[in-house]
């Protein structure tokens, strides 16, 4: 938390976490302004999109707390910086994580730039994460902080603070969102507060109920913001060309037909369309009713490969290679033993980091990792400190 009282623009999403964040900051004496971000044009999607109701909820929260709220449309920025990349990744056969890119490009870039124009000293969101000032490093270079339009200001801020900024996991391990924030830069962290990062979710709900916030009992949002509650395949079908092809098992036996490789992801169990197919002979694990999982996508031959059983060797990887690395400190960690997540909510897995050139790195695991998926993020940790990460390119 910031000891200095200053103007803080809070991203009010219409949910309980951002609402309590705004209230906590006002209690600390900050000048708090709410800002609701509209990141998707939903004019044709009334059945699925909840942004109108979310704004009404955010406005009600602002009224109860006694702060101003501004409505800002970042839909154009979102389409250019996030959604276009999302589609490119799916077209290439990978499974992207748009929430990671949205945080780096919209919630902590477009939002931050807008807040600075409003005279804010900092921004705040309802993410479950923490920011800590690290000890000063001798001869600390200024270079990594040039990534932001506010770079010059933030270099001075970091020098004043006596060191770099670290991104830490939220104290509530079950709600920690540092995985989605691993691409934030020093410039962004220098301007960011996470007021609920020090609290368990149960305490956030208790505070909201105690001060009678209208969203105290509102369910947490789920899914990708621009998809809402609609079936994922239905949504992608509007934007991606697709061609049906064979579904085969590891022996090359055709089991059915897929509707387009882009609609499937590694480790997927539901919606494959071969639920009634049994493995002939003794299946792995001794059960011919073991579920089928997507294991590989052969794009040159437009073939989807599936295997039976959660623990099938095709679903296990001891090594991954990643690219497009982004490091919180601005430079890669030293080679050696760390921990990593290859998907959200996964337990930290011990690994050995081997940094490479041009934003690439390799991770080697002592224990096989399940369904490591190209396009998803591999995020590295040193204890509670999130070091950054990259986009998974391949696994073996």
From Swiss-Prot:
Pfam families: tRNA_Me_trans, tRNA_Me_trans_C, tRNA_Me_trans_M
Keywords: ATP-binding, Cytoplasm, Disulfide bond, Nucleotide-binding, RNA-binding, Transferase, tRNA processing, tRNA-binding
Region annotated Interaction with target base in tRNA, chain positions: 97-99
Purpose: Catalyzes the 2-thiolation of uridine at the wobble position (U34) of tRNA, leading to the formation of s(2)U34.
Residues the record marks as site: Interaction with tRNA: 127, 376
Family the entry assigns: Belongs to the MnmA/TRMU family.
Protein name in the entry: tRNA-specific 2-thiouridylase MnmA
Gene: mnmA
Lineage of origin: Bacteria, Pseudomonadati, Pseudomonadota, Betaproteobacteria, Burkholderiales
């Amino acid at each position: 938390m910031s000891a200095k009282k200053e103007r803080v623009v809070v991203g009010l999403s219409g949910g309980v976490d951002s609402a309590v964040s705004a209230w906590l900051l006002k209690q600390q004496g900050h000048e708090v302004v709410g800002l609701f971000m509209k990141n998707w044009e939903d004019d044709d999607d009334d059945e699925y999109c909840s942004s109108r109701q979310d704004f009404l909820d955010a406005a009600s929260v602002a009224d109860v707390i006694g702060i101003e709220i501004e409505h800002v449309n970042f839909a154009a920025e979102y389409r250019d910086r996030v959604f276009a990349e999302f589609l490119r990744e799916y077209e290439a056969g990978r499974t992207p994580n748009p929430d990671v890119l949205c945080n780096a490009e919209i919630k902590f870039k477009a939002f931050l730039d807008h807040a600075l124009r409003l005279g804010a000293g900092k921004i705040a969101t309802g993410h479950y994460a923490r920011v800590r000032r690290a000890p000063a490093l001798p001869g600390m270079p200024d270079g990594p902080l040039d990534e932001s339009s506010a770079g010059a200001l933030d270099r001075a801020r970091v020098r004043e603070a006596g060191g770099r900024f670290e991104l830490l996991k939220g104290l509530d391990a079950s709600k920690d969102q540092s995985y989605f924030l691993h691409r934030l830069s020093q410039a962004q962290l220098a301007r960011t507060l996470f007021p609920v990062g020090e609290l368990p979710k149960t305490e956030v709900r208790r505070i909201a109920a105690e001060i009678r916030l209208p969203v105290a009992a509102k369910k947490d949002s789920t899914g990708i913001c621009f998809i809402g509650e609609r079936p994922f395949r239905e949504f992608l079908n509007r934007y991606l060309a697709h061609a049906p092809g064979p579904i085969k098992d590891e022996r090359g036996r055709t089991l059915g037909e897929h509707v387009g490789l882009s609609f499937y992801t590694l480790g997927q169990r539901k919606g494959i369309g071969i639920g009634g197919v049994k493995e002939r002979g003794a299946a792995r694990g001794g059960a011919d009713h073991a579920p089928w999982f997507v294991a590989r996508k052969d794009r040159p031959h437009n073939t989807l490969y599936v295997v039976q059983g959660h623990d099938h060797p095709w679903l296990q990887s001891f090594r991954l290679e990643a690219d497009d690395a982004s490091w919180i400190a601005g430079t890669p960690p030293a080679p050696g033993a760390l921990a990593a997540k290859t998907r959200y909510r996964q337990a930290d897995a011990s690994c050995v980091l081997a940094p490479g050139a041009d934003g690439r790195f390799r991770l080697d695991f002592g224990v096989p990792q399940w369904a490591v998926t190209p396009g998803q993020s591999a995020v590295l940790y040193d204890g509670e400190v999130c070091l950054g990460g990259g986009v998974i390119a391949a696994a073996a």
